[in-house]
Amino acid sequence: MHAPLLLALALAAGSTPRTFRVDAFHTGNATEERLALDRLVLEPLPFPGNPDRPVDDLNLGKYLFEVRDLASNRLLYSRGYASVFGEWETTAEAKEVNRTFHESFRFPAPDRPVQLVVRKRDKRQAFREIWTLTVDPKDMYVDTSSPAPAGTVIEILKSGPPERKLDLLILGDGYTESECKTFEAQARKATDALLAVEPFRSRRGDLNVRALCPPARESGVSRPSTGVHRNSPVGAAYDAFGSERYVLALDNRRFREVASQAPYDFVAILVNADTYGGGGIQGLYATVAAGSLWAPYVFVHELGHHIAGLADEYFTSDVAYLPGERIEPWERNVTILSDPARPKWAVTPGTPIPTPWDQADYETRAKGFQEKRKAIRKRNGPEAEMDALFLEQKKVESEKLSAEPYAKKVGAFEGANYEAKGAYRSEVDCIMFSRDDVPFCSACRSALDDVIDQYAGAPVRTAPSR
């Protein structure tokens, strides 16, 4: 960001505090974990969060961090979140080895010492303390240096000051300087896709969207399964946790240095690649292969994970995670339906719970497509072949699901959250379930609305919801 823009943002913020960041290492395995301080950072920009909602009351996330006044123990700020470690610890690899991942905690810069408290959900979904750290904002080791310039911030949608809007930052990764115009076009296309669906369509007045393209020395990002390695500015790469389509940026320090140059509550990373892929972690970032035919869909789907902690509603695709103990998920769009008389969300009157649908036929078809997909990847087939398969799958599944007796009704449809049995979603089809041309389901929209409220306050609606 150019110096005049930095100054303008600082002046516009008035007394808004700067953004303070605690960088930490998160180490462990499937059964144990610990956190350790890396460094304290005072970021260059004011804190973008809503000053009227500093304490998180949404009960989302596998983890929760709190910032408390050291002298009085008064709660000053909190946020629920998920993390790379929190996902990795559920993989088979975590049963065999220890690994360390880097993560950050951002909050309004305090004017006196505070206590950072990190909590994690236990088996009953209650948050239990796992780490504390005393933070003195006047410590001589607080890093106040300016990050290396990452380019000029592009204003895609400006609806108001950062502290009164939900601020989405779109970062490019793997774009050379000559390709940054391509990135900008892709970022605008992705934004259009987001604003075409509810609740974002009717709440565009509650959003700011900015983009930033740090120039890469080489075009593209890493894809280890094909022998491709790139030292890209944000460090995004395919094959996370051994899943060929899962794209993560594991160099959190590098990611934060780039992102700190624009106001953000949430971040989407567009990777310069054509191969289908992406990822989304609540409160961390979303990723998408911007050159893929399916980029608009993946962008919206992964932001569902990132912004509102929405669970995947599908149950037939291969994932790296191992099944866990059956407890009610904290995610708002899935349930184990422990009490059918009291479902997790409002149900369409007259809809039976559980809600019948032809799951067996769907599952047979879906698994057939999965086998074809694996075969294409195994022989490194062209992406056009994968696109054709996905288009065929979309046609078949759209026709099937739209013809279900309870299509477009809110109920409890079995099959969700990677589980074919015992887990339920609110509608038969949804952006979090398939690549079909459908909206977010009712449960997803409600969760997303609540998060937008948290950052932007009362809704500024520009069109009616569905």
Language-model-derived ranges and their functions:
Residues 139-201, 211-221:
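Fold-level signature of zinc-dependent metallopeptidase catalytic domains
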